[in-house]
Amino acid sequence: MRSIALALAAAPAVLAQSQLWGQCGGIGWNGPTTCVSGATCTKINDWYHQCLPGGNNNNPPPATTSQWTPPPAQTSSNPPPNNGGGGGNTLHEKFKARGKQYFGTEIDHYHLNNNQLMEIARREFGQITHENSMKWDATEPSRGSFSFGNADRVVDWATSNGKLIRGHTLLWHSQLPQWVQNINDRNTLTQVIENHVKTIMTRYKGKIFHYDVVNEILDENGGLRNSVFSRVLGEDFVGIAFRAARATDPDAKLYINDYNLDSANYAKTRGMINLVNKWVSQGVPIDGIGTQAHLAGPGGWNPASGVPAALQALAGANVKEVAITELDIQGAGANDYVTVANACLNVQKCVGITVWGVSDRDSWRSNENPLLYDGSYRPKAAYNALMNAL
């Protein structure tokens, strides 16, 4: 996840400061904790604080990892059918009927006791992505010591309910334990990456069909983001991770996933296409590109109107498939959601859409009301528009 951003040049500062849209805090962060003029350091989640323009009026709240509190348990005498089942009358079933693999959502272990949310997830969606419990800090907090309890709970729920699962994520610069960030030896980091990838994918082999092998590795100019992976290994970490993934589970589809890929001519979008083509030509087994699609409303810099051309451009890369992986839209405009759904329907390589949460109450952007269900778990106009359009 990431706040929607267009990277802009910032004025130089005498003291070290993070640039607009840069990181400015979070667990394990050792860089600048103040922002350049015109930006405010805003907590996105416990691990990531970001320099956002101006004040906090339109900034996302802390992620639900640390803030979410389950509502009182509610019982249902008539639980909805499993497998996204509703007699062909659910988002997932309608999307599949149009030739796609899935229409999915994001949940995590801290949602499992929320009966209202989970009933919607069970009824409407055919694919699940973990929000946080498969990230490195959750799965390997210390070297060689793995913890799978929370990730397992989500996998068990998904498999028992017939849901596809996207593994999110194997390598990410954020929510990364300090022991990994402290590595400065090439051979050590290579071994750590390979072991992390192989251990997770071995555990879930045959259960997870897509993996975001690397997540948010590009900067806004379309080059590699500065991270421990790029500092120690350069571009080689991409091949190391993908080759380890392919060797461990040859049947899983392997993705590179990023945000701000919502305009066909934006430098980051072009950089993604160029780098993926280069890496694939070098034998790196990248199967797909995931575009997160954390979108602004009309008038914002990355509205839904840019998605059709951007998705078509990404599909032009030398990959087998593309997917919209973390969709949410400021204000949840009905026309905006239909525009994004049609973009995927009109691109042959687009295999599916994942919305980043079930309801506005549980969204990392809850003050922007970006999802298909409101804070009381009632379907919104965007949901109804999608059902009618599909």
Swiss-Prot record:
SUPFAM superfamilies: (Trans)glycosidases, Cellulose-binding domain
Signal peptide range in chain numbering: 1-16
GO molecular function: cellulose binding; endo-1,4-beta-xylanase activity
Catalytic residues as annotated in Swiss-Prot or TrEMBL: 216, 326
Biased composition (Pro residues): 59-82
pH dependency: Optimum pH is 6.0.
Catalytic function, reaction form: Endohydrolysis of (1->4)-beta-D-xylosidic linkages in xylans
EC number from the UniProt entry: 3.2.1.8
GO annotations of cellular component type: extracellular region
Intrachain S-S bonds: none
Ranges for region Disordered: 55-92
Job description of the protein: Endo-1,4-beta-xylanase involved in the hydrolysis of xylan, a major structural heterogeneous polysaccharide found in plant biomass representing the second most abundant polysaccharide in the biosphere, after cellulose. Is more active on soluble wheat arabinoxylan (defined as 100%) than on birchwood xylan (72.4%) and beechwood xylan (665.3%), and less active on insoluble wheat arabinoxylan (39.3%). The major hydrolysis products of XynC are mainly consisting of xylobiose and xylotriose with a small amount of xylose.
Protein name: Endo-1,4-beta-xylanase C
Organism: Humicola insolens (Soft-rot fungus)
